[in-house]
Amino acid sequence: STALHLVDHQANQAMELALGQAPDPLPLDRIETIHVHNALHADWSQIFPASPQVMIVGNPPFIGHKTKTRDQVEDLKAVWGKDYDGYLDYVTAWYKKAADYFHYTRGGRFAFVSTNSISQGLPVAALFKPILAAGWRIRFAHQTFAWTSEAPGLAHVHCVIVGFDKREKTPATLYSYDTPNLEISRGCGLDRRNEWRKV
């Protein structure tokens, strides 16, 4: 709770500095729906039932396949089961959990900020093949961009954002950058063969 109040205060100060005024503080004392669990062991549907109105977005931990702890490897094995190949980054477990969470729900959507290693080399097939085979499609993706943090001692990383849905009638979008920053340079669509094409 203290961390939430601190972040709210910092965000309000930044907004006041940028815009000249800040909103009222969030009613954080009245939040009764915050659950403290290992997200990879929790049954998400018991915490919040899946429905077409639910959208999962997040920024899971950035831990590559070479830097995982023994406990994190066990987390990945528990989530991925027989599909865990040893090369998957820790963040991929959130993609799998979200896809499973919405398994029986039409209209669910999820997206995560991830290190760009999920879209390179060995992890690509291990992550995307089972999710696409389950009927999900990439609704949007941001190609590599630089992620910086104001926290002391944190390394700068290169990230992607990938969002999934099952709504085939909605055009898919790729946000592409000439340099790894957040300036959107062009939009692209994804056809059924998973080939990117310009819109």
Residue ranges and their predicted role:
Residues 35-36:
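Conserved residues in the N-terminal Rossmann fold of short-chain dehydrogenase/reductase
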Residues 1-3:
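Short alpha-helix adjacent to the SAM-binding motif of class I
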Residues 26-28:
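Surface-exposed helical/coil interface segments that assemble multiprotein signaling complexes
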Residues 5-16, 21-24, 39-199:
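Signature of N6-adenine DNA methyltransferases within the class I
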Residues 32:
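Carbohydrate-binding/catalytic loop surfaces
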